[in-house]
Curated annotation (Swiss-Prot):
Its EC number is 4.2.1.9. Belongs to the IlvD/Edd family. Functions in the biosynthesis of branched-chain amino acids. Catalyzes the dehydration of (2R,3R)-2,3-dihydroxy-3-methylpentanoate (2,3-dihydroxy-3-methylvalerate) into 2-oxo-3-methylpentanoate (2-oxo-3-methylvalerate) and of (2R)-2,3-dihydroxy-3-methylbutanoate (2,3-dihydroxyisovalerate) into 2-oxo-3-methylbutanoate (2-oxoisovalerate), the penultimate precursor to L-isoleucine and L-valine, respectively. The modification N6-carboxylysine is found at residue 125. Homodimer. PANTHER family: DIHYDROXY-ACID DEHYDRATASE DAD, DIHYDROXY-ACID DEHYDRATASE, MITOCHONDRIAL. Pathway: Amino-acid biosynthesis; L-isoleucine biosynthesis; L-isoleucine from 2-oxobutanoate: step 3/4; Amino-acid biosynthesis; L-valine biosynthesis; L-valine from pyruvate: step 3/4. This is Dihydroxy-acid dehydratase. It catalyses: (2R)-2,3-dihydroxy-3-methylbutanoate = 3-methyl-2-oxobutanoate + H2O; (2R,3R)-2,3-dihydroxy-3-methylpentanoate = (S)-3-methyl-2-oxopentanoate + H2O. InterPro entries: DHAD_IlvD/Edd, Dihydro-acid_dehy_C, DihydroxyA_deHydtase, DiOHA_6PGluconate_deHydtase_CS, ILV_EDD_C, ILV_EDD_N, IlvD/EDD_N. The keyword Ribosomal protein does not apply. The gene is ilvD. It is an enzyme of class 4 (lyase). It comes from Saccharolobus islandicus (strain M.14.25 / Kamchatka #1).
Length: 558
């Protein structure tokens, strides 16, 4: 049955004449005011290529909604560009922006009594932020990803932004010249759109499809593709059907839908940030999802997609062979997906995949069969142990290391760790510990890409890293993040000392500090938290409200 509309209570009837007067001021006619009023929430910013073009996409989405008999009004949300903030105070605002985006969409939607929602995003936190709002609002909603950039090239090598970060380390280690670094910088990201590898933005775009919240095939076309425009228009049109049939976001965002998304994440070897974001979206949808669900699904799901940074290909390559539905179909045929879940098409996942038009081209070089995987286990593993009682995350798709034991080299900030790598303090065989970079400690749980890229770029191939911060989706190597509890709240990572032995054991799903329980307890008794880095402003407010990484680092009422 049709969804109950919000807009009549705000815009119909004698007493709402002042409200209608304002709608007339922006060009709506009597006929348009009488139609369902829908929001186009657009994460738009000129501060970077990821969301530079989304305002234009919003205009296309409006055309699609009008074709479906709806009256659209667009509004922007904020965007924090992760790459520009990387390695600076700006990165502390990245994860914060996810929850701010969710709050902004909620506020705009409810304040203006919209009936349905189209969300358009690009950079890392925009997709989960908008999906969190959709889950929270529980209204007819559909998402469209803005698309990735085309890859760059230099000296016959295909480039992504990951190569620029690692080139800095290579230059500092005198492995390349300054001119080579400059040429890589100029060529790595040649168009509008998000980072081209399967980093966080493309991972979350893929998750929007796997959750059933986006049209099949819509995540993979590049930002510059004409098919991107087509998908945006069709997304706008599809909202009309959702409203007509009364399909709301929580009808789609079920526990089974999240299992499908986690399965897809594991099969594609996507970003560890997706663990945080899926937990957060599930929280807003009222779905009980835990880190244990990720490991349970990881064990049964093979890693089959050779996507950068763990593999060889970028999103544009996946698009050429059929996009995310190619991965989903292989998983469905292997009995690894719930085919009966509802999606934004009004059809089930199985129906979508049966009706999707797959290109008649080879794809096994990018997406393998489930019976011939790259690795038998999914691309992400959750570790627990004496160093991470509530959990930590490692991306095994981006490393072949299954066990690492080494002496700790401890730093209390990302900046100190970066200087340590630069100055040669970090030696082969060591485990770099970066703490007080968690949700409350940093605050904002920044990504450690500057440090991990410096390690890789310097040729330190036998160094691991453990942090209560996050990693960029571009990170590769034996890097463990999201350690919970974090140092700021007295997690065991707070009492690690230089020279302590750290054990990372993927097969046993363990992350341990090789000390006796008694010694750990004694050190924790002697520990006291440092003063907060921020005592006022947004980051101080965020630190007071945010939960631990093991719970999705969502902000909750105090």
């Amino acid at each position: 049955m049709p969804a109950k509309l919000n807009s009549p209570s705000r815009y119909h009837g004698i007493y709402n004449a002042p409200h209608r007067a304002f709608l007339r001021s922006v060009g709506l006619t009597d006929e348009e005011i009488g139609k369902p009023l829908v929001a186009i929430a657009t994460a738009w910013s000129e501060a970077g290529p990821c969301n530079f073009h989304t305002l234009a996409l919003a205009r296309v989405a409006k055309e699609g909604t009008k074709e479906a008999g709806l009256s659209p009004l667009a509004f922007p949300t904020m965007v924090v560009n992760d790459n520009i903030g990387m390695g600076s105070e700006g990165m502390r605002y990245s994860l914060v922006s996810r929850d701010l985006i969710a709050d902004m969409v909620e506020a705009q939607f409810n304040a203006h009594a919209f009936d349905g929602l189209v969300g358009i995003g690009g950079c890392d936190k925009t997709t989960p932020g908008i999906l969190m709002a959709m889950a929270r609002l529980n209204v007819p909603s559909i998402y469209i990803y803005g698309g990735s950039a085309e890859p760059g090239y230099f000296m016959g090598k295909r480039l992504t932004i990951e190569d620029v970060h690692e080139a800095i380390g290579a230059y500092l280690a005198k492995r390349i010249t300054e001119n080579e670094l400059y040429e890589i910088e100029k060529r790595a990201h040649p168009t509008l759109g998000t980072c081209s590898g399967l980093f966080t933005a493309n991972t979350m775009g893929s998750m929007s499809e796997a959750l059933g919240m986006a049209l099949p095939g819509s995540a993979s076309p590049t930002a510059t593709s004409s098919r991107r425009v087509m998908y945006v228009r069709e997304t706008g049109k599809a909202l009309g059907s959702l409203i007509e049939n009364g399909i709301k976001s929580r009808d789609i965002l079920t526990f089974e839908a999240f299992e499908n998304a986690i399965t897809t994440l594991m099969a594609m070897g996507g970003s560890t940030n997706a663990v945080l974001h899926l937990l957060a979206i599930a929280y807003e949808a009222g779905v009980k999802l835990t880190l244990d669900d990720f490991n349970r699904i990881s064990k049964r799901t093979p890693y089959i997609a050779s996507m950068k940074p763990g593999g060889d290909y970028v999103m544009a390559d996946l698009d050429e062979v059929g996009g995310v539905p190619v991965v989903l179909k292989k998983l469905l045929d292997a009995g690894l997906l719930h085919g009966d879940v509802l999606t934004v098409t009004g059809k089930t996942m199985k129906q979508n995949l049966e009706q999707y038009k797959y290109p008649n081209v080879p794809h096994s070089h990018i997406v393998r069969d489930v019976k011939n995987p790259i690795k038998p286990r999914g691309g992400i593993v959750i570790l627990k142990g004496s160093l991470a009682p509530e959990g930590a995350v490692i991306k095994v798709a981006a490393t072949n290391v299954v066990k690492f034991e080494g002496k700790a080299k401890v730093y209390n900030s990302e900046d100190d760790a970066f200087k340590g790598v630069q100055s040669g303090e970090v030696r082969e065989g060591e485990v770099v510990i970066i703490r007080y970079e968690g949700p409350k400690g940093a605050p904002g749980m920044p990504e450690m890409l500057r440090v991990t890229a410096a390690i890789m770029g310097a040729g330190l191939n036998n160094v691991a890293l453990v942090t209560d911060g996050r990693f960029s989706g571009a990170t590769r190597g034996p890097m463990v993040g999201h350690v919970a509890p974090e140092a700021m709240v007295g997690g065991p990572i707070a009492i690690v000392e230089d020279g302590d032995t750290i054990v990372i054991d993927v097969e046993s799903e363990r992350l341990d500090l090789k000390l006796s329980e008694e010694e750990i307890k004694n050190r924790l008794k002697r520990w006291s938290p440092p003063s907060p880095r921020y005592k006022s402003g947004l980051l101080a407010k965020y630190a007071s409200l945010v939960s631990q990484a093991s719970m999705g680092a969502v902000t909750r009422p105090a």
